[in-house]
């Protein structure tokens, strides 16, 4: 099901140099506070992978715990070689000298925006931190809608028009960020869109930053990820990390693949200069474990396969509940996100005083303990009745439950996940009922 046309919607970008706390982190902190107060919650705002670390990763980290010296700014040779192999196996031949490691791909993305300079074009909707990081560099973001039924990549034709118009106005747009697969929609842009994006980037001399942190969580392995590095290798930076497919978000370890050639070497030198002044080097013990992880031994490859299946099963089960409530729900292709649109229910919501995405997210959180994020957090106008829903914290209250979910052929039927799904349906039925029923207390769990 295609997304509605958003080409006339105004961009929502923070003022240059200023930003508040990340919307995802703020929502997660609110949910944790409610949980501590004894309030039942459905935590679907924070994009954490929600699974225990594989024992092999804990072993590798423990064995490297004594590594307390600073290392190379670009990362250890073993890590850079392992990351190069990871990309080469995915059809992107990579030399270790093109790899830069950092304390998470988020830090690398900020470093790249900082040294590239100028404004950055971003998809609308797109991950909350792209525009915020652009603001922190003192520049700004140019929001460009995604094509219908796709996510993560600005519509190439609209991108060309938007950049040319911005430049005529004196704005200095130098780069474009894409997310393959996408956060917030869980969708994956097709090969024709990515290929045309590369053509536009070459015509307009834009650098491409391709955030591929969810690449290994595509639900159907036959649904291939097309990286812009395959079509515009001379101007594409690719980033990834351990946070999503291996659920190691707290380890803060990411890697970037810089373009080959003179431009790439200059960009790499600039990035290393910034890195040397900001983070010095990625944590040495984590680099050792990351080198093991990017080597993709069979035990970790199997773990990622099972994780992918769990994410797919629960994300689609949650999508079914939103669809049953009357929402438009583009089916997710990857990861643990979906992006339901309550537009068809706008009249019923207005009867409850809900007229914007932030209104809707606030109602779900404050009254029902259901955490989501409004589309406005991802660059949409406030009036968009769309929510980003993350399903990965529904897998269990402890590691025993989460591991059982990981091993289950039908995790959505496990009692604790089924209860969460039923609670979600109950809340959605109450919120979207033809007649308002909000005067008293919400229905109990």
Which residues does each PLM region occupy?
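PLP-dependent enzyme catalytic core of the Aspartate aminotransferase-like
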Residues: 2, 93, 350, 363-372, ...
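Conserved core segment of the aminotransferase class I/II
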Residues: 4, 235-309
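N-terminal small-domain helix-loop-helix segment of the aminotransferase-like
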Residues: 5-103, 147, 296-297, 395-398, ...
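Helix C-cap/helix->beta junction micro-motif
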Residues: 37, 137, 203-204, 325
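Conserved PLP-anchoring active-site segment centered on the Schiff-base-forming lysine
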Residues: 115-134
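Hydrophobic residues in well-ordered beta-strands that form the structural core
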Residues: 122, 143, 208-210, 372-374
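Active-site phosphate-binding strand-loop segment of PLP-dependent enzymes
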Residues: 148-224
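Conserved glycine-rich beta-strand-loop-beta hairpin in the small C-terminal domain of fold type I
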Residues: 308-316, 323, 329-348
């Amino acid at each position: 099901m295609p997304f509605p046309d958003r080409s006339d919607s105004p961009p929502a970008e923070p003022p240059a140099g200023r930003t508040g706390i990340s919307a995802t982190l703020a929502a997660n902190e609110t949910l944790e506070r409610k949980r501590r107060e004894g309030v039942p919650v459905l935590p679907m705002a924070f994009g954490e992978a929600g699974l225990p670390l594989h024992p092999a990763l804990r072993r590798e980290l423990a064995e490297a715990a004594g590594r307390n010296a600073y290392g190379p700014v670009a990362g250890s040779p073993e890590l850079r070689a392992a990351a190069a192999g990871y990309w080469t196996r995915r059809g992107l031949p990579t030399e270790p000298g093109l790899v830069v490691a950092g304390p998470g791909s988020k830090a690398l993305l900020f470093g790249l925006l900082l040294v590239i300079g100028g404004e950055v074009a971003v998809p609308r909707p797109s991950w909350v931190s792209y525009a915020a990081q652009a603001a922190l560099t003192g520049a700004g973001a140019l929001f460009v809608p995604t094509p219908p039924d796709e996510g993560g990549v600005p519509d190439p034709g609209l991108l060309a028009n938007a950049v040319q118009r911005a430049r005529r106005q004196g704005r200095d747009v130098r780069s474009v960020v894409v997310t393959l697969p996408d956060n917030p929609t869980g969708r994956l842009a097709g090969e024709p869109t990515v290929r045309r994006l590369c053509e536009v980037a070459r015509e307009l001399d834009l650098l491409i930053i391709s955030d591929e942190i969810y690449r290994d969580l595509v639900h159907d392995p036959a649904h291939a990820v097309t990286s812009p590095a395959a079509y515009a290798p001379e101007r594409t930076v690719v980033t990834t990390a351990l946070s999503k497919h291996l659920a190691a978000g707290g380890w803060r370890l990411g890697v970037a693949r810089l373009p080959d050639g003179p431009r790439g070497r200059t960009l790499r030198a600039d990035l290393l200069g910034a890195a040397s002044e900001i983070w010095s080097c990625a944590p040495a013990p984590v680099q050792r474990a990351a080198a093991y992880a990017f080597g993709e031994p069979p035990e970790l490859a199997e773990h990622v396969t099972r994780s992918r299946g769990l994410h797919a099963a629960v994300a689609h089960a949650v999508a079914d509940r939103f669809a049953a409530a009357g929402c438009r729900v583009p089916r997710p292709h990857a990861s643990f996100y979906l992006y339901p649109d309550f537009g068809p229910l706008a009249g019923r919501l207005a009867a409850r005083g809900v007229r914007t995405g932030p209104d809707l997210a606030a109602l779900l959180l404050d009254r029902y303990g259901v955490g989501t994020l409004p589309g406005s957090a991802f660059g949409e106008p406030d009036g968009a009745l769309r929510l980003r829903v993350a399903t990965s914290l529904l897998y269990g209250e402890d590691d025993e439950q989460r591991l059982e979910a990981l091993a289950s052929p039908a995790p959505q039927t496990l009692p604790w996940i089924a209860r969460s799904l039923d609670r979600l349906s109950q809340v959605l039925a109450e919120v979207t009922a033809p007649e308002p029923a909000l005067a008293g207390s919400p229905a109990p769990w």
